[in-house]
Amino acid sequence: MSKLKVIPEKSLTNNSRIVGLLAQLEKINAEPSESDTARYVTSKILHLAQSQEKTRREMTAKGSTGMEILLSTLENTKDLQTTLNILSILVELVSAGGGRRVSFLVTKGGSQILLQLLMNASKESPPHEDLMVQIHSILAKIGPKDKKFGVKARINGALNITLNLVKQNLQNHRLVLPCLQLLRVYSANSVNSVSLGKNGVVELMFKIIGPFSKKNSSLIKVALDTLAALLKSKTNARRAVDRGYVQVLLTIYVDWHRHDNRHRNMLIRKGILQSLKSVTNIKLGRKAFIDANGMKILYNTSQECLAVRTLDPLVNTSSLIMRKCFPKNRLPLPTIKSSFHFQLPVIPVTGPVAQLYSLPPEVDDVVDESDDNDDIDVEAENETENEDDLDQNFKNDDIETDINKLKPQQEPGRTIEDLKMYEHLFPELVDDFQDYDLISKEPKPFVFEGKVRGPIVVPTAGEETSGNSGNLRKVVMKENISSKGDEGEKKSTFMDLAKEDIKDNDRTLQQQPGDQNRTISSVHGLNNDIVKALDRITLQNIPSQTAPGFTAEMKKDCSLPLTVLTCAKACPHMATCGNVLFEGRTVQLGKLCCTGVETEDDEDTESNSSVEQASVEVPDGPTLHDPDLYIEIVKNTKSVPEYSEVAYPDYFGHIPPPFKEPILERPYGVQRTKIAQDIERLIHQSDIIDRVVYDLDNPNYTIPEEGDILKFNSKFESGNLRKVIQIRKNEYDLILNSDINSNHYHQWFYFEVSGMRPGVAYRFNIINCEKSNSQFNYGMQPLMYSVQEALNARPWWIRMGTDICYYKNHFSRSSVAAGGQKGKSYYTITFTVNFPHKDDVCYFAYHYPYTYSTLQMHLQKLESAHNPQQIYFRKDVLCETLSGNSCPLVTITAMPESNYYEHICHFRNRPYVFLSARVHPGETNASWVMKGTLEYLMSNNPTAQSLRESYIFKIVPMLNPDGVINGNHRCSLSGEDLNRQWQSPSPDLHPTIYHAKGLLQYLAAVKRLPLVYCDYHGHSRKKNVFMYGCSIKETVWHTNDNATSCDVVEDTGYRTLPKILSHIAPAFCMSSCSFVVEKSKESTARVVVWREIGVQRSYTMESTLCGCDQGKYKGLQIGTRELEEMGAKFCVGLLRLKRLTSPLEYNLPSSLLDFENDLIESSCKVTSPTTYVLDEDEPRFLEEVDYSAESNDELDIELAENVGDYEPSAQEEVLSDSELSRTYLP
C-alpha cells in the first residue's frame, strides 16, 4: 500500500519480510478473511519480533504504520489466538525498546484499546488466564507513560476487574503478579487509590505479604510496592491504622531483618519501610508507630545495618521515618521574640512588626496548639501530571512580566526644596579650593599627562571630624586619638575650611547655572592624569605603634593594655579584666591569661613578625587596626543591651592566615550519624543532662562552677547567642537570638567559649536555624578565633570544625514565626571541635566578624593617614540611626592640581560612583569587600590615583549600623529588612535608607546621576562572587516570550562591568550573574535605583560565605584576603569601565566590549535566569538523606512574607538582594 512505501528509515525497505507481513495483515483487516490467515501472519510477525531486534526497530520506526496495523487488528479480531499473538508482539516491543517504544504505543492509542480488551475479556467466565496475564503485563508497562491512564482505567471499570482477579486467584501467582503490578499503577491516582481501598485492597495486600515467608518473594515485593502506593491515601492509611497493620508491618520487618542474613531480599525490606513511611504521613500513623515501639525497633535495626554499605537505603529510609515520627518539641524559650526590646518611635500599621506588637501577651508564640495535628499532605500527583511535566524548561514565576513596570521611570519622589538638605554633603560640587594647600601654588594651563609622577601613601589612620552638617548630627570623637599631632592639626584645619565654605558654596551652586550645564555635559567625565608632586607625608612619618599589634615593636608593648586593666577575679590561668571606664560603664576584655604576653621569647617575636609580613598584603604601610583606638571608639557605640565587654578578636584584630583553607570534604554518613544521635535522646532519655549553662532570658542566671562545663558568652558588639543547654557531657544545644523587634532571622552567630580541655571532641548544635539548606552542607566551616593562638602571634580567624551538616530537626516553628505557615520545623547546624589549648578563650562566628566600631576605627585611620594634597577625603554623617549611632558617609576623589578654573571644573565634572554595603548585618563579608575597596581607593597605587582622578566616590560603608552592633542577622532595630524599604523608606523607621536614597535623588535632581551604583552583599547559598543587575530585555527573555523580547531595544552597557570583573577578579563568576528583575526584589536598592533614580548600571554584588568552585580559588574557602582583593578588583574594573566609556580612549580590547549584536539568546547561556538558588548550587549528595523530616522533598518557601529572599516582602534566605529560599527545578 502507498503508506508502506514512504518510509524514511534506512533500515525499513519495501522488500523486507516484516513490511510484507504487515501489509498482508492490514489487508486482512480491510477484507474479512478466515482467522487462520490472521493467526499465521501474526505468528510469523511474533517470531520475527522475538528473534530480531531489526524487526522490532522497523515496526516502531518513525513513519512506520506497523503499530497502527497491530492495534487495529487487536481491536477488530474475534480470534483468541490472534489476540494472544498480537499481545505477545506488543510485549516484545515494549520490553526491549525502553521508554521510547512504550510512549510510541501510548501515542497510537494503545492504552484505550487494551483497557477495552480487558473489559471484554472479563466477561468470559472464567476469564482466559493467558489473555489476562498478557493484558495486565502490557498495561502495567505503558500505564506510567500515559498521564491520563488513571482516569481511563477508572472510566472503563478496569479497577474492580483487576482487583477481583487477585481476590479470586490468590494462589495463582502467575496471574496475580501482573495484576499487582497494574494495581500499583492504578494507585498512582489518588481517586483510584481511595476507590480501591473501599473495596478491600489494603486488607488484600496484607494477606499476600504476611505472615513471614521466603516463598514467592517476587510477589511479596510487588505487593509491598503496591501497598506503599495505596497507603499514600490518607483514607487507606487510616484504614490500615484502625486494623492494627502498623504493628504488623513492624513485626514483618523485624522477621525479614533477622532472616535475611545474606541481604538478598533488601528490596522487600525496603518495601516494608516504604509502607511505614506512607502510613506515618498521618498523625494516627505516627502515634501507632510510637505506641508499637517503632522508634526503638527501627533505631536498633538501622544500627545493625550500618556495617553493610549496600543496606544504606534501609538506614536512610529508617532515619526518615524516625525523624518524621519524632515528637515535635518546643524550643526551650519563653518567647521567640528577641531577648532585647527596643521601643520604636513609630509603630508600623501593617506588616510583621505590626503583627508582633499587636500579639496579645497571653499568646504562646513558640509553638502552635495544633502543631502535630495536621497530616503531612503527600497525596499522589493528580492525573493531570506526570513525570514528563517536570522536565519543562526553567520558569521563574516571580519574574516581572509587565513591560511598563520594567521600564525605568525616574521619579523625583521628593521636592527640590526638600532635597536641598543634602547640599552640604556635596561640597565638592561647589568648592573653589582657594584656601587649600594644593600641589600647584600657581595656576597653570590644564594639560593631560599620561603618567602619575608622585607616589601616594597608603592611608592608615584617621580622626572623625566634628561639627554640624545641616540638621544631621555628627559623632564627636576625642582628639587624643590622633596618632601624630601635626598631621591631626593639619587635617583639622583642612576639614574646618571645607565646613566654613558650605554656605558660600550653596550660593555658588545656585548662582552658577553655567557650571551646572558644564557638569551635565560631562557626566561621563574626562580621562585626565594630572601631574603630581611628591607627597609631603611619607611612610616613615607614620608611627610604628599603629601596627596591628604583632610586629616586634608592638610585641613589647602588647602587655600595656593588660597592665592598665586590673584583674577583677583571681585565677592562675585566666582572669577577667576591667577598669577602663565607659563614662560610667566598665569595659571588660573577657578572660585572658595575663602572663601569656610576658612569657613570649625573642625567637617567637621574630618569627611572628615574619609571619605577619608574609600574610598581610599591605606592602606600603601599617594595617588599619589599633587596639587602643578601638577601645575609645567602643565607648561611643550605643547598643540596646548596653554592652560593656569587648570581644578579643575585635580588640586584637585579624590578619589572614598564611595558608589556604580548602573546602571541607564531607565524609559519607555524617548526617545520618548525627540524626541517630538526636533520636537517641528519645530512646535513651536517661543519658540526657539537659542543663542550662547560658541564658539571656534569665537575668538571675548563674554560671555553673563545674570544671568540665564549657562557659559561653556573647555580651559584646555583634554577639548573638541566647541560650545554651548541655545535652551530654561534651554536647551542647545553642539557641540564637531573633533580630530585635522580630521573631525570626536566626543565622548569624558570634559567641565566646571558655573552659575547654584539649583532646576532647565537643559537639555544638545550633538548633533554631530557618533556611531550608545551607553551604554548611557543601564544605563551609564555621570560624574560630583562639586567644592563645593570638598571643602566640597567630591572630586570625580560621575555618574550624568537622562532622558538619545542616538538617531539619524536631523543634517546631510556630505559625507566628513562619509567616502563617503551620507545621514547619527549625533546622540544625551541627559541628564538632577539638580545641588545641587547655582553658583557652575561643570565639565562634558564622563569618568573619566586622563590627561597627571596627569600621569607625578603619575610617579614622584612613582619614588621619591620607595626604590631603593628593586625596580628597571627607567623612560626614549621613544621619543618626534609631539608637543614636552615626551612619558614616565617605567621599573620595583626587584633589585638583590647583585652584585654576579648568582644574576645578574638571574636578567637579567627574562622574559619581555610589557604593553601599552591610544593609544586612549578618553579611559581614560585604564589609570586608568594602574594606578592600576603601583601602585601594586610598592607596598610593598609580591605578588608584587614576581611579580617583576619574570618579567621585560616594560611599555608605554600613547602611545598618544598629543591626550590626546588636548582632542582628537581617534587620535593623525596626524589625524590618532595610533592603526591602527602598521604594517608600520612612525617615523615622528607616533613616539610613531614607537619606541614602535622598542622596541619589539629589544627584538626579542636579543632573549628576552616578555612572555606577553597587550595593555589597553576602550570599549564604551560592559559591563565588557575582552580580545581579537589571535588564528589561533579559527579564522579558526569561518569560519565554521571544516575540516580545525581540521588540525591546536596550543598551547592554549593564553587562560591561560584570564582564570586566570576570576577566580580572579570580573569585568572580559570570555564570552566576543574573540581570532579571523579579517581583519580590522590586523594593530592593538595586531595582529602585535602576527604576526610580535611572542608574542603568545598578548592581548588587554578592560574595559567597563559603568559597569558590571555579577559577584560581577553586576548591578553597573564601577568606578576608580574597574578599578584600575583590573589593580592590572592583575598583580596577571601574577604571577599565571608565576607559571603555571615555571618548578620549582608543585601542580598546574587543573582548571587554558589549556590542549591540551580542544577542541575549547567547548571553543567557552564561548567566543565571534567576536570583534564586538552583539545583547546581546545592546538588544532591551520595548520602541520600532528605534534609527535611517529611517524606516529600519540599521546595521550602521560607517565611510567607519572604519571597525571593526570606524577608517580609519576599521569599529568600533572608538572604540578601540575593538569596532565596525557593529552589526552582530546571
Swiss-Prot record:
Resulting phenotype, residue 910 to C: In CONDCA; uncertain significance
Effect ascribed to mutating residue 990 to L: In CONDCA; decreased tubulin deglutamylation shown by in vitro functional expression of the homologous murine variant
Cofactor note: Binds 1 zinc ion per subunit.
The protein's required cofactors: Zn(2+)
Keywords carried by this UniProt record: Carboxypeptidase, Cytoplasm, Disease variant, Hydrolase, Metal-binding, Metalloprotease, Mitochondrion, Neurodegeneration, Nucleus, Phosphoprotein, Protease, Zinc
Reported effect, residue 851 to M: In CONDCA; decreased tubulin deglutamylation asshown by in vitro functional expression of the homologous murine variant
InterPro entries associated with the record: ARM-like, ARM-type_fold, CBPC1/4, Cytosolic_carboxypeptidase, Pepdidase_M14_N, Peptidase_M14
E.C. number(s) listed in UniProt: 3.4.17.-, 3.4.17.24
Domain Peptidase M14: residue ranges: 848-1138
Sites bearing Phosphoserine, chain numbering: 1168
Residues that hold Zn(2+) according to the record: 920, 923, 1017
Domain of life: Eukaryota
Catalytic activity: (L-glutamyl)(n+1)-gamma-L-glutamyl-L-glutamyl-[protein] + H2O = (L-glutamyl)(n)-gamma-L-glutamyl-L-glutamyl-[protein] + L-glutamate; C-terminal L-alpha-aminoacyl-L-glutamyl-L-glutamyl-[tubulin] + H2O = C-terminal L-alpha-aminoacyl-L-glutamyl-[tubulin] + L-glutamate
Stated name of the protein: Cytosolic carboxypeptidase 1
